């Protein structure tokens, strides 16, 4: 049985942002432009694009650095900064129930759920020949794209 998760506040002031790819960068920039305090940005670790290449920072890590924001690769650190809630955009990993039980989160998913749950929803919609798609914004749940 799932535990009851906290509701995001109606008017948050401080937001932890969790995201990884280029597709998440506009959301981060808009939150900053709108005046939200972003005490922490959480992203996936730097990755090599090939065996011989040096590790490359994620697009979100690069954008956060340009914006002067603190970056971490550890989602648990989101609990340490006193934010009102978290916003998740294409983060790339599930958020633990321990974190969700203490910090309400909102997820932005690039499909009309429940269709194309999981990774690469835009690409999968194109490959399937979908003529209509969209974006879902939902309270994050412990399961994948089910909030």
Describe the residue ranges of each PLM region.
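Short acidic-hydrophobic, aromatic-tinged amphipathic segments that line or gate anion-handling sites
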Residues: 70-74
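Short amphipathic alpha-helix with an adjacent loop that forms part of the alpha/beta core around
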Residues: 75-84
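Donor/substrate-binding cores of folate-linked one-carbon enzymes
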Residues: 14, 34, 85-147
